[in-house]
Amino acid sequence: MQRTNKRYPIGSHLVVYHFGYSHHGIYAGRGRVIHYSGFAHLFKKKPIEITTLSQFSHGKKIHVRHYEHARYKGRIVVRRMRSRMHENHYHLILNNCEHLCSWAI
């Protein structure tokens, strides 16, 4: 099982690779990740939520997606993610966890 006690900069775009798909979230600080939980619950439609790093990663290695020209950074990214909390418009193709993170950054 992969340890998730590594520190990430606030506002980092985190990615976990699973068989056949990847899951994306934004690091919000204090070991928490904001993400669209659609894939996290086996394709069930769920809202944007805050979970721990270990809940987000399910024991998999966490990768950081780097942006050369990010429009927003740090706490502003987290604020943008929080502005969409409890949204429940997940769509595998049109509005997924990766789209949400890219929008926030």
For each feature predicted by the language model, list its residue ranges.
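Cysteine-nucleophile amide-bond enzymes
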Residues: 1-105
